[in-house]
């Protein structure tokens, strides 16, 4: 299957192709990107939510695609993960 590569604040995310006509495409794409960023940080959901100061339930719903994280929040979190990795804090 065709894969698409997205770059979110310097973190490359490879995603299986999601049909452009899929009504839930954007929500599913952001959910997958959010999960990938968390995995890049090397944390489980609980640790990641504590580290970011985001309620666990909110983060879980973003990651499962039940709610859509705002795009700017995804970019800010990706930036924080990238910077903390560069500083050696992750």
What would you call each of these model-derived segments?
Residues 42-60:
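Short alpha-helical DNA-recognition segment
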Residues 32, 36, 57-60:
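Positions in alpha-helical segments
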Residues 1-28, 78, 83-90:
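N-terminal flexible/basic segments that precede or flank functional cores
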Residues 33-47, 76:
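Short basic helix-loop element that most often maps to the first helix and adjoining turn
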Residues 29-30, 54:
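Alpha-helix N-cap/N′ positions at the starts of helices
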Residues 66-78:
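Short, basic-rich loop-to-helix N-cap that marks the start of a DNA-contacting helix
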Residues 55, 66, 80, 84:
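The DNA-recognition helices of helix-turn-helix-type DNA-binding domains
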């Amino acid at each position: 299957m065709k894969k698409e590569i997205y770059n979110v604040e310097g973190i490359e995310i490879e995603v299986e192709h999601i049909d452009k006509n899929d009504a839930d495409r954007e929500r599913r794409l952001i959910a997958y990107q959010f999960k990938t960023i968390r995995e890049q940080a090397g944390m489980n959901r609980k640790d990641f939510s504590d580290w970011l100061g985001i309620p666990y339930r909110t983060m879980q719903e973003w990651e499962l695609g039940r709610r859509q994280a705002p795009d700017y929040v995804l970019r800010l979190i990706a930036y924080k993960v990238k910077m903390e990795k560069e500083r050696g804090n992750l």
